């Protein structure tokens, strides 16, 4: 398979799994309450266990189901909270690590090997479903398109879709945090703040940690693909902001107290405010080092953040959401943008 074909496969997998592609018509979908999510989780894990047994029987390394991710990661806590027992989620995402045999430390080459791993295990998954027809699934619906979007049959009636979010061993711990939103807040909010920070420094803060892309010794955006060298800045979710400071200064810096308090985030306690505080600490650190103006950096990041929030709501509107849903999104945007603004202007 050519490099371009592998890149296209990588894009399609991420497109389906980040854009929330749905196979199920509304009348077949179960409402995703905490109880339903946890029932679907057990059925999905049972399906993966069967797949892994089949892989082992052929001397193929098994995949590793890491954890629920996205908003549904809070289902266990929400089920125990009487005030949130009836909350519903937009979808169910499960983080799964596909084995990859790395033959080089070069990140560009490693990404090609990771894409090959995705292709291999996606094809094996499809073959397993066709041959074994696991009883946890609606086989026909699952095989209808991308098999990483698994249609689980709920014994009491109806179906749910579990989206397999693919990662690889070096990024498992990072992805536990990066794909976790703040509880009760849409994931696109934190996603836009990561993006605004990354865009300011021409870095990517995504599925493989914090990456810098170089062409002709200059950092370039992810839109530039040809003749690009990739450098890993951080895969440590608890320390990635400190790692960015080290990268930007070449290691010659004294962390601001705010950055010491918020060097990254706790995957178990992700919040917009914690990320904003860490970004503010990073700005103060780099200003003290004489690299940039803290106020200018925070102002530009905030402007990009706001544009991203507005674009997200605009995309939702084109999907015919109700006025009530639109108003709810606008309220979330207003509340979270105020939190970020207050932090950025208060340091």
Language model regions located:
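Structural alpha-beta junctions
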Residues: 53-61, 127-138, 196-206
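Active-site nucleotide-donor binding segment shared across nucleotidyl transfer reactions
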Residues: 48-110
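Alpha-helix boundary/N-cap detector
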Residues: 4, 35, 39-42, 116, ...
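Positively charged, low-complexity intrinsically disordered regions
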Residues: 8-11, 15, 80, 112, ...
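Metal-dependent nucleotidyltransferase catalytic core
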Residues: 37-52, 96-158
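Helical scaffold of the NTase/Pol beta-like nucleotidyltransferase catalytic core
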Residues: 8-69
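Catalytic cores of NTP-dependent nucleotidyl/adenyl transfer enzymes across multiple folds
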Residues: 140-346
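Short linear clamp-binding motif
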Residues: 3-16, 340, 344
